[in-house]
Amino acid sequence: MNPVVHFEMPAEDKNRMADFYTKAFGWKTQMLGPDMNEYVLVTTTEPDENGRPRNPGAINGGFYKKSADMPAQYPSVVIGVGDIKEAMKKDMEAGGKVLGEPMEIPGYGLYVSFFDTEGNRVSMMQPR
């Protein structure tokens, strides 16, 4: 079984969104630079020495800037997989639609998004 390992939410203004979740829920945010497409890492629970959530069942996530050329910009989850190419194949066989090829997220692993059979944008990641 492949677990949910991350969430993502789009933002018109990533600074405003980071400020909101920090004030409302105590989340910690880390602004990444242009080499990571200005992504914002979000920590919702105390991490262990490897940066993974210490609390069972808890996940961390990120915010990304909304873009006119990106489909289905809604809150979504990221599913951890052992072999991203095999998971992409199974996704398509089950009726999903993979959105492009996996991209390397430096320090984390391979990442690709897909639409499920109901039109939800979901992503998968093969950790390093």
Predicted feature residues:
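N-terminal beta-strand motif that seeds the catalytic metal site of vicinal oxygen chelate
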Residues: 1-20, 74-77, 81, 127-128
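Short acidic/glycine-enriched loop/turn segments that link adjacent beta-strands
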Residues: 35-39, 72-73, 106-110
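Mid-chain, well-packed structural core segment of small domains
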Residues: 67-94
